[in-house]
Amino acid sequence: GSICLEPKVVGPCKAGIRRFYFDSETGKCTLFLYGGCKGNGNNFETLHACRAICRA
């Protein structure tokens, strides 16, 4: 889906939550630390969920 093409958004908060996003340049789901607020759709709780939705 189109959410997989959205940029990684850490957001302004500082929670440091382990999440995964789809990196459209590499075609892979990658770990990042999410701040906890004001993110976007390219933000998955698990690697499996990221791969399932973005077909990585």
Curated annotation (Swiss-Prot):
Keywords: Disulfide bond, Nematocyst, Protease inhibitor, Secreted, Serine protease inhibitor. Its main location: secreted. The record marks K14, A15 as: Reactive bond for trypsin. Signal peptide: none annotated. It holds the Pfam family Kunitz_BPTI. One of its GO terms (molecular function) is serine-type endopeptidase inhibitor activity. This is PI-stichotoxin-Hmg3b. It comes from Heteractis magnifica (Magnificent sea anemone).
